[in-house]
């Protein structure tokens, strides 16, 4: 049983903590917080030992009635690996200032640059490449979504070119300080970072992405166009999606024609926090015209990367050499379809 810690018990960190706790070959030793907020309080109430990353704030936690087990540095000494879920840029700094100095393996999230970490991870696409690695970056929610559906297409047909438009949610549901509220905000930088990010996983894929923000909090959606190498049918694509791990073909005809209905479905499945770990692909959107594949998918930005973190732990700590076995083990423990 390997000892795992979470540095940054926020939107992703708290979900990874629960996912690790559901496994039988790893355990959560502790989690860290900077401020005494409801997430810190909930962590203690759930039974996680809470460590503070700013020791000078211990009195603030005491005043809030939140029990502290020690400092982040004390937690790190107890771990086989830390999952760093701190805001983008801080993780890379922690890698240099802390983890490398004490010889602690670490996983980082998609807010970090690939070059700063050295290796990027997607369980289906490059698990084997990350076996035994010391520092690995789990790519962002959007990049994870693209990799999950492009990889099976790549395998059955080959891909000449991908063009994708990312319709991104404006903020997470709990983030009251961000927007937009009544606006659509284009990301005028082209390509958006998502295309180059996919290439850190599937390096020989030709992919170009554009993105925009819209006033919703539920999910991202992707409109994807793929020029195929070989002639295949829509049934071939749908079969590939059906057989792919963590991809969920859904039907508008079953009243799953919107992100709101998909997230309601996740709640009806009894998912913790109403999470949708899989990438829903609308079956009715899958079409091939003149050798070009079109489809639409959704991405739950708060949770699709969570099982990837679990598989990355197994790869880095060499708990399982077979990526598919790790994926299936994680899926079973988390109730992933």
From Swiss-Prot:
- Tagged with keyword NADP: yes
Stated EC number for the protein is 1.2.1.59
Q: Where in the cell is it found?
A: Cytoplasm
Return the Gene3D superfamilies for the record: Dihydrodipicolinate Reductase, domain 2, NAD(P)-binding Rossmann-like Domain
By its UniProt entry, which PROSITE patterns does this protein fall under?
GAPDH
Q: Where is this region: Disordered?
A: 177-196
Family from the record? Belongs to the glyceraldehyde-3-phosphate dehydrogenase family.
Give GO terms for biological process.
glycolytic process
Q: Name the pathway it acts in.
A: Carbohydrate degradation; glycolysis; pyruvate from D-glyceraldehyde 3-phosphate: step 1/5
According to the record's subunit comment, the protein's assembly and interactions are:
Homotetramer.
A GO MF annotation of the entry reads: glyceraldehyde-3-phosphate dehydrogenase (NADP+) (phosphorylating) activity
The entry marks the following residues as binding NAD(+), namely 11-12, 111, 169, 301
Tell me the enzyme class: oxidoreductase
Alphabetically list the UniProt keywords. Answer: Cytoplasm, Glycolysis, NAD, NADP, Oxidoreductase
Q: Which InterPro entries match?
A: GlycerAld/Erythrose_P_DH (IPR020831), GlycerAld_3-P_DH_AS (IPR020830), GlycerAld_3-P_DH_cat (IPR020829), GlycerAld_3-P_DH_NAD(P)-bd (IPR020828), Glyceraldehyde-3-P_DH_2_arc (IPR006436), NAD(P)-bd_dom_sf (IPR036291)
| Gene Ontology cellular component list | cytoplasm
What is this protein's record name? Glyceraldehyde-3-phosphate dehydrogenase
User: Where along the chain is the active site annotated?
Assistant: 141 (nucleophile)
Q: Which residues bind D-glyceraldehyde 3-phosphate?
A: 140-142, 194-195
Q: Which reaction does it catalyse?
A: D-glyceraldehyde 3-phosphate + phosphate + NADP(+) = (2R)-3-phospho-glyceroyl phosphate + NADPH + H(+); D-glyceraldehyde 3-phosphate + phosphate + NAD(+) = (2R)-3-phospho-glyceroyl phosphate + NADH + H(+)
């Amino acid at each position: 049983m390997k000892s795992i810690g979470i540095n940054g018990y926020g939107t992703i960190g708290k979900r990874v903590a629960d996912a690790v706790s559901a496994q039988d070959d790893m355990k959560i030793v502790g989690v860290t917080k900077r401020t005494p907020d409801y997430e810190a309080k909930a962590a203690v109430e759930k039974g996680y030992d809470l460590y503070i990353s700013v020791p000078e704030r211990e009195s603030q936690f005491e005043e809030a009635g939140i029990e502290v087990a020690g400092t982040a540095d004390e937690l790190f000494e107890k771990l086989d690996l830390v999952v760093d879920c701190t805001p983008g840029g801080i993780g890379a700094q922690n890698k240099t200032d802390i983890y490398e100095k004490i010889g602690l393996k670490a996983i980082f999230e998609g807010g970090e640059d690939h070059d700063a970490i050295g290796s990027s991870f997607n369980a289906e696409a490059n698990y084997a490449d990350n076996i035994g690695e010391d520092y690995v970056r789990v790519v962002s929610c959007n990049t994870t979504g693209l990799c999950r559906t492009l990889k099976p297409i790549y395998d059955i047909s080959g891909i000449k070119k991908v063009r994708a438009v990312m319709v991104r949610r404006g903020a997470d549901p709990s983030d009251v300080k961000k927007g937009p509220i009544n606006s659509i905000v284009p990301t005028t930088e082209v390509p958006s970072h998502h295309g180059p990010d996919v290439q850190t996983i599937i390096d020989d894929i030709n992919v170009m992405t554009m993105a925009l923000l819209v006033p919703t909090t539920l999910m991202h959606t992707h409109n994807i166009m793929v020029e195929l190498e070989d002639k295949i049918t829509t049934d071939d694509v749908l079969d590939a999606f059906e057989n792919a791990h963590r991809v969920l073909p859904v039907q508008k005809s079953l009243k799953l024609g919107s992100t709101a209905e998909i997230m309601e479905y996740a709640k009806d499945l009894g998912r913790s926090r109403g999470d949708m770990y899989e990438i829903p692909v609308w079956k009715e959107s899958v079409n091939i015209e003149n050798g070009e594949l079109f489809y639409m998918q959704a991405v739950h930005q708060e949770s699709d990367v969570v099982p990837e973190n679990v598989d990355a732990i197994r790869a880095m700590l060499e708990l399982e050499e077979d990526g598919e076995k790790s994926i299936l083990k994680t899926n079973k423990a988390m109730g992933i379809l």
